Design a protein with these regions (language model features):
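Active-site nucleotide/adenylate-binding loops and adjacent lid/helix of ATP-dependent enzymes
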Residues: 1-44, 54-57, 81-95, 239-247
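Short, flexible turn/loop "capping" segments at secondary-structure junctions
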Residues: 6-7, 73-74, 217-221
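Short acidic/glycine-enriched loop/turn segments that link adjacent beta-strands
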Residues: 11-12, 44-46, 178, 220
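Alpha-helical scaffold segments in soluble metabolic enzymes
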Residues: 26, 99, 160
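Phosphate-binding core of ATP-grasp and ATP-grasp-like enzymes
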Residues: 31-35, 40-83, 91-131, 137-145, ...
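C-terminal structural cap/anchor segments
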Residues: 126-132, 138-187
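Peripheral (often C-terminal) accessory segments that flank ATP-dependent C-N-forming ligase machineries
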Residues: 162-253
Length: 253
């Protein structure tokens, strides 16, 4: 299989997986007028490296975000979005993120670099657990992800960026109080085991954001969202299940 996507795109819009000759011919029969990129399909966990870089391309702030289900599948298969920011950045990803930023000569920017973490050995790409580059974005990640970084790291990335622009350094104290911050969306028309009231009753002490999203974000992020700050990955998974499990497959958490 291969993936085709616009050379300049946002949120996996007009991105498809082509699995056979018929898919390929159908794509070329209705070839879009804008430039497209075709790339090898890679099986792995989607992880991203975010950083605020100073004038010397050195990071003033770093973050890792994990996207269990790629946005392309969320949009094309009408799935619910869930993802989370992490309290720490693994050394392997941190080193790759820094090297990639330097290779592109990026300075005085907020960057969002995407990688696949291979779930199995892949000839020509790497071993299980290795990171494979997907795309580079010389901008922050979308949605409320910058706010999720703030909750995860007990910091203020907006102030760090402002400090970088004015002083070429961060003047925000580094906190040791770190968490996972998880986003779980709900789409219009989907059925769920737990009501809004039940979610707030169970997780209200951990929820830091809960609101209806702008309509433009509904295909990717869902109409309603819940964002929680949690200490363990097990809690993250339990929160996602509680928010998104449909009635027919649900069980009381």
């Amino acid at each position: 299989p291969v993936i085709v996507k616009p050379d300049i795109g946002v949120g996996a819009a007009n991105t498809w997986k082509l699995e056979n000759d018929g898919d390929l011919e159908a794509f070329y029969d209705a070839l879009p007028e804008i430039p497209y990129v075709m790339e090898e399909f890679v099986q792995g966990d989607l992880c991203s490296y975010e950083a605020i870089l100073n004038a010397s391309c050195e990071p003033l702030f770093e973050n890792m975000t994990v996207w269990p289900t790629p946005i392309m599948n969320i949009v094309n298969d009408d799935l619910d979005l869930m993802y989370y920011t992490c309290p720490d950045v693994p050394k392997k990803l941190r080193d790759l993120g820094r090297k990639t930023s330097r290779a592109f000569g990026v300075d005085r920017r907020f960057v969002h670099l995407e990688f696949f973490r291979l779930t199995g050995d892949r000839k020509g790409l790497g071993k299980k657990g290795d990171y494979v580059g997907l795309e580079v974005n010389m901008r922050p990640p979308g949605g409320y992800t910058p706010d999720m970084m703030n909750f995860a790291h007990s910091t203020d990335v907006y102030q760090i960026y402002a400090d970088m622009a004015v002083f070429d350094e961060s003047r925000v104290p580094v906190s040791e109080d770190k968490y996972y911050c998880v986003y779980a969306g709900r789409k219009e028309g989907h059925l769920y085991r737990h009501t809004h009231e039940e979610i707030l009753d169970r997780w209200g002490g951990d929820i830091v954001m809960s609101e209806e999203m702008p309509p433009v974000n509904w295909p990717q992020m869902g109409r309603f969202m819940y964002t929680a700050r949690l200490k363990t990955l097990a809690e993250v998974r339990s929160f996602i299940r509680f928010v998104q499990t449909p009635p027919e497959r649900g069980r009381q958490e």
